[in-house]
Amino acid sequence: HLLEAAEEDLEIVGGEVRVVGAPQLAVTLGELARVLKGAPGYGFPQGMDPGLEASATFRVDQLAYSNACHVVEVEVDIETGGVRILRYIALQDAGRRVNPLIVEGQVHGGIAHGVGNALLEWMGYDAGGQPVTTTFADYLLPTATDLPNFETLYKESPSPHNPLGVKGVGEVGVIPAAAAVISAIEDALSPFAVRISQMPVMPHELVELIAKGPTG
């Protein structure tokens, strides 16, 4: 309509819709979107409403699973039960990274969440079943001072099950983190045969577990 040409005589090249064989007769995709939105001064053929809208359904028959390996080094004060994370290394395979910066942010946030699950985020209830950790004064979250600099590595093995070769990235940050931290604590306290069966593990609980150990 804008170029006064039939649909079959149009092509999209370099961000423009243009008439085949007459590249000077063209309109940019941005201008086309502005017009279709209903820009003043443009009329539409009868039966055509302003708007730029399309819908489609994409179905994935097979899921794309992510993989990760997290390694943590911790220091535990056996007198206070305090835990300090000295080093955190995370190797991720989230398929093709379309936007590496967003992937890095997702992984960092996931690790922080997992550390919180392992050490801080306790949800408590009173005898009547009412929550007692209802503010951030009671429900503790990790801050920057609780976390080390994360060392992140990436192996891109594109998924064969979708056109972009992508996999989920949120899960590979958060799910291994808590297990890696707890495993590191158990390893650090191996002389005391400490086994941790619930999260988060609080300092006073670690002191009690150490005291129950063979060398406690």
Can you say where each PLM-predicted feature lies in the sequence?
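C-terminal catalytic domains of large/alpha subunits in multi-subunit enzymes
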Residues: 1-216
